[in-house]
Amino acid sequence: LDYIPDLYYDWKLGEISYTKQGKGKPILLIHDLTTYSSGYEWHKITEKLAENNTVYCIDLLGCGNSDKPNILYTNFLYVQLINDFIKNVIGDKTTVVATGESSSFVLAACSNNSEIIDNIIMINPMDINILTKSPNKISELITKFINSPVFGTFLYNIFTRKNKVKSLENQDQQHIRHHKRKFYISIVKIL
């Protein structure tokens, strides 16, 4: 992948990688939350958005080129990161665009401090019914299994192999080619 963020925010739990382009009203782009997610997901749209805005594209803690500390990652951790990033790096009321699972903690960040978030745009957010489910015995057992050092590391290595990420990038390219014109135009019109 040819995406190399060039700026870092020294956050309390590690260095957070991000890019900054353009001038104008600030927009923060937040990627989905999967093992292979990063700000690279936005690389095709940042230039267009940067024509009239200051565009910040972040690699969340544990993703992309940001630090990956051996900690328990929670939604509240990301809520704190988003709030701190907007306050300490952007320093102005910001439009936040989020995809997938990251949408839920962007909403929580806004609820936590609505004075720093101007608008929220969610792309393919998680179903609210899934997000509000309480863990049961089976899900707790699966979580323990995934968090075990041997099996968890094994799964992480499988999901982050270069050929797996390249395969996903190719799938994304096919999907993007099909929908990108409509998607880009709608995002640019909103902003």
For each of these PLM feature ranges, what is it?
Residues 14, 19-65:
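Conserved HGGG/HGGXW glycine-rich cap/lid loop of the alpha/beta-hydrolase fold
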Residues 57-97:
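Active-site loop/oxyanion-hole signature of alpha/beta-hydrolase fold enzymes
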Residues 39-41, 66-72, 131-133:
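Conserved catalytic-core motifs of eukaryotic protein kinase domains, centered on the activation segment
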Residues 96-99, 123:
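Short beta-strand immediately N-terminal to the catalytic nucleophile in serine-hydrolase-like folds
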Residues 131-133, 153-191:
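Conserved alpha/beta-hydrolase catalytic His-Asp/Glu region
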Residues 1-15:
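N-terminal cap/lid segment of alpha/beta-hydrolase-fold proteins
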Residues 107, 111-112, 117-151:
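Flexible "cap/lid" loop of the alpha/beta hydrolase fold
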Residues 98-106:
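Gly/Ala-rich beta-loop-alpha elbow adjacent to hydrolase catalytic centers
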